[in-house]
Amino acid sequence: MKEPLIEVKREYNLIKTLTGKKFVVSTSIVVVLLIINMIFYGIRIHELAVIRRNSETHISSFNYKGQAQAQNKRVKNTRLFEKCKSKFNNFCIYGECMNIINLDKKFCICNKGYTGNRCDIVSIR
């Protein structure tokens, strides 16, 4: 089994003999480029952090100096329930009759102490 350190030294010596003194120069250039790269991206990361912080605290606004246009649309009925018509006054025994608008179904809102579909049962509670 070969020692890893011996193999690295052999490869280093092989590269050194193949490139001669150029190897030292190219290594220096790589080191300088790495340092420049670290400085550049260090500054960029700081700038990006500032941009992000500003975007999180920025509140956008705009000024509008125009006339509002009239809308000729009918407002849809947004109610779900309405009181029953007078002919259903006696539908709920001890409560108030309500109509589900879209289904035209009746239900009762019982007075305190009563329950059941038509508020006709005395509640035990």
Swiss-Prot record:
Keywords: Disulfide bond, EGF-like domain, Growth factor, Secreted, Signal. One of its GO terms (biological process) is positive regulation of mitotic nuclear division. It is found in: Secreted. Disulfide bonds join 84-97, 92-108, 110-119. The keyword Disulfide bond applies. Residues 80-120 form the EGF-like domain. GO terms for molecular function: epidermal growth factor receptor binding; growth factor activity. Its main location: secreted. Residues 1-48 form the signal peptide. The keyword Disulfide bond applies. SUPFAM superfamilies: EGF/Laminin. PROSITE patterns: EGF_1, EGF_2, EGF_3. InterPro entries: EGF-like_dom. One of its GO terms (cellular component) is extracellular space. This is Probable growth factor FPV211. It comes from Fowlpox virus (strain NVSL).
